[in-house]
Curated annotation (Swiss-Prot):
Protein name: Division inhibition protein DicB
Organism: Escherichia coli (strain K12)
Gene responsible for this protein: dicB
Pfam families in UniProt: DicB
InterPro entries, A to Z: DicB (IPR008022)
Organism phylogeny: Bacteria, Pseudomonadati, Pseudomonadota, Gammaproteobacteria, Enterobacterales
The keyword Cell cycle belongs to this UniProt entry's keyword annotation: yes
């Protein structure tokens, strides 16, 4: 029987691992990866929303 683990090479997999093991390093890495994945930045998921918030200049709400 195979165990399906999240792919640490993707932002979603990295975020899932970070949340599962409560490791902020994985979570931050996932957010930074998502900032670079422009085609996925508008996807409706937590990691995309956090990445968009980090990209907005401070003091500028959109």
């Amino acid at each position: 029987m195979k165990t399906l683990l999240p792919n640490v090479n993707t932002s979603e997999g990295c975020f899932e691992i970070g949340v599962t093991i409560s490791n902020p390093v994985f979570t931050e890495d996932a957010i930074n990866k998502r900032k670079q994945e422009r085609e996925l930045l508008n996807k409706i998921c937590i990691v995309s929303m956090l990445a968009r918030l980090r990209l907005m200049p401070k003091g500028c709400a959109q």
